[in-house]
Curated annotation (Swiss-Prot):
Gene3D superfamilies: Aldolase class I (3.20.20.70). This is Isopentenyl-diphosphate delta-isomerase. It comes from the Bacteria. Optimum temperature is 60 degrees Celsius. Its main location: cytoplasm. The keyword Lipid metabolism does not apply. It catalyses: isopentenyl diphosphate = dimethylallyl diphosphate. GO terms for biological process: isoprenoid biosynthetic process. The gene is fni. The lineage of its organism: Bacteria, Thermotogati, Deinococcota, Deinococci, Thermales. Its cofactor is FMN; NADPH; Mg(2+). Homooctamer. Dimer of tetramers.
């Protein structure tokens, strides 16, 4: 199966298949925001503005990486980018590996024309560093007119796919390439970063990490849908670090590094919990896929509702901004 066909099948699985975790949850349900009835705060005072990767976002929100390089990629990415521009939030692009292999795929990623001011983050698998070097990374970011580059690390997904399954020496390889002339972050894809993973990254000059915990989309389930047309190994596909635990573990090891929480953080209230646990930003991907097929307005409406819920949740706990949410949570 070529890479373009695989991307098409990924979209199909995410739209039609049962690719969410079936048993594993984000763990956010195990925490309760500490409500404050006398915080002395006005809702209008709650300011979601958040600096990230050299830009100032109007809210601590990123559109998660989804696609590019297949037939619907351009349509989806343009809708997502238009919404990001309108709302002042950031956007992660889908994996750019296909661009390095097939430069003609650039059209489906080229969104800067509709998002001239938005934060755009290019994306490449960490495992691709076995075949690509510094010049390739510079070329990728330049072609996409991106502001930053995220390396995704996804060993379970690759193993189920029977893709790039040799992850030896990749942290050392990344260390050789850094620093680059733009911010670099590392992210999982939905199975979570652990304390041990954070320790492995601790000495690198990274600009951020995205814990991408378990509880939302299981990319192992996606790959089984693509490979078999069904999920044959459901227990295997439940492996991962729940999002809440991933936030706590990574924040303990990396106390000052900007931390993105994704992985089933699908409501503004859960977003507030993630911020309270130690995240700086939130990212959402799959729930925006179908709205993106319907257009930028639908994407903007979904995100707008999310951010209004987030703002209200912060108000309810007496937090004037995302930073003030830190610690305003308790275990149930």
């Amino acid at each position: 199966m070529n890479i373009r066909e695989r991307k098409r099948k990924h979209l199909e699985a995410c739209l039609e298949g049962e690719v969410a975790y079936q048993k594993t949850t984000t763990g956010l349900e195990g925490f309760r925001l500490r409500y404050q009835a006398l915080a002395g705060l006005a809702l209008g005072e709650v300011d979601l503005t958040t600096p990230f990767l050299g830009k100032t976002l109007k809210a601590p929100f990123l559109i998660g990486a989804m696609t590019g390089g297949e037939e619907n990629g351009e349509r989806i990415n343009l809708a997502l980018a238009e919404a990001a521009e309108a709302l002042g939030v950031g956007m992660m692009l889908g994996s750019g590996r296909i661009l390095l292999e097939r430069p003609e795929a650039l059209r489906s990623f080229r969104v800067r024309k509709v998002a001239p001011k938005a934060l755009l983050i290019a994306n490449l698998g960490l495992a691709q560093l076995r075949r690509y070097g510094r010049d390739d990374l510079l070329r990728l970011v330049e072609a996409l007119e991106a502001d930053a580059l995220a390396f995704h690390v996804n060993p379970l997904q690759e193993a189920v796919q029977r893709g790039d399954t040799d992850f030896r020496g990749l942290v050392e390889r990344l260390a050789e390439l850094l620093p680059l002339p733009f911010p670099v972050m590392v992210k999982e894809v939905g199975h979570g970063l652990s304390r041990e993973a954070a320790l492995a990254l601790r000495d690198l000059p990274l600009a951020a990490v995205d814990v991408a915990g378990a509880g939302g989309t299981s990319w192992a389930r996606v790959e089984e849908w693509v490979r078999f047309g069904e999920v044959r190994h459901p227990e295997l596909c439940e492996i991962g670090i729940p999002t809440a635990r991933a936030i706590l573990e990574v924040r303990e090891v990396l106390p000052h590094l900007p931390l993105v929480a994704s992985g089933g953080v699908y409501t503004g209230t859960d977003g507030a919990k993630a911020l309270a646990l130690g995240a700086d930003l939130l990212a959402v991907a799959r729930p925006l896929l179908r709205p993106a097929l319907e257009g930028a307005e639908r994407v903007a409406a979904w995100i707008g509702d999310y951010l209004e819920e987030l703002r209200t949740a912060l108000f309810a706990i007496g937090a004037k901004n995302p930073k003030e949410a830190r610690g305003r949570v308790e275990r149930v």
